[in-house]
């Protein structure tokens, strides 16, 4: 998610960067602050966030740069990330809407386990759903991407979960309000 001020700066920089080589040389460098709770050694950070930032920097000819802050390095909690983008403290965040129980109620369904079999198809459905039915939940920012991890995996230390029966006897912490309700 990105706040509208940053989107405007990025859009202007991108428009200038694509107009001509001569103009590109004169275009100002835009530096965007990217903040997330993901650890810098995590797969999501290395293979998605960092890779995306590197690609944007390269394709913009170095005119769009990033200050990257994984692992909540700028302070706050994961619950506060959305407000940090909304309030202009940072330009781009990556977070889980389910971390903020009740704030984005219409998209919480996309975090339920056993609801999907293909992360790519479900991520596309998530995007279309938000654009069509839930855009007002994110009205203070410009959503850049939405994704799910497939297929709604439940993580444990030593037991694979294939069905509800596999949960018997386990102590489980739910990542969001609907999942915690289902587990209760």
What are these regions (language model features)?
Residues 22-37, 50, 57-65, 159-171:
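Immediate post-signal peptide segment of exported/extracytoplasmic ligand-binding proteins
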Residues 54, 80-86, 91, 96-184:
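Contiguous mixed-secondary-structure segments that line small-molecule binding/active-site clefts
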Residues 33-50, 71-76:
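Extracytoplasmic "Venus flytrap"
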Residues 63-79, 83:
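Early extracytoplasmic/lumenal segment of secretory-pathway proteins
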Residues 30, 72, 76-77, 90, ...:
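N-terminal glycine-rich cofactor-binding segment that shapes the pocket for flavin-like pterin cofactors
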Residues 12-20, 27:
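Hydrophobic alpha-helical targeting segments used for export or membrane insertion
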Residues 42-67, 177, 181-184:
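Short, polar/charged alpha-helical segment
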Residues 1-15:
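N-terminal secretory signal peptides and thylakoid transit peptides that target proteins
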């Amino acid at each position: 998610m990105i706040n509208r001020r940053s989107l405007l700066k990025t859009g202007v920089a991108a428009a200038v960067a694509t107009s001509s080589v001569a103009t590109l040389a004169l275009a100002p460098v835009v530096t965007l602050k990217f903040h997330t709770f993901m650890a810098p050694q995590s797969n999501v950070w290395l293979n998605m966030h960092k890779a995306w930032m590197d690609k944007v920097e390269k394709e913009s000819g170095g005119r769009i740069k990033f200050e990257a802050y994984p692992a909540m390095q700028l302070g706050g909690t994961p619950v506060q990330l959305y407000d940090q983008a909304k309030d202009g403290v940072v330009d781009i965040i990556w977070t889980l809407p389910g971390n903020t129980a009740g704030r984005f109620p219409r998209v919480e369904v996309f975090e339920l386990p056993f609801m999907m079999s293909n992360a790519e198809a479900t991520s596309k459905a998530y995007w279309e759903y938000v654009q069509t039915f839930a855009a007002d939940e994110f009205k203070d920012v410009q959503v850049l991407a939405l994704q799910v991890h497939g297929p709604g995996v439940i993580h444990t230390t030593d037991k694979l979960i294939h069905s509800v029966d596999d949960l018997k006897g386990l102590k489980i912490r739910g990542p969001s309000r609907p999942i915690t309700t289902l587990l209760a």
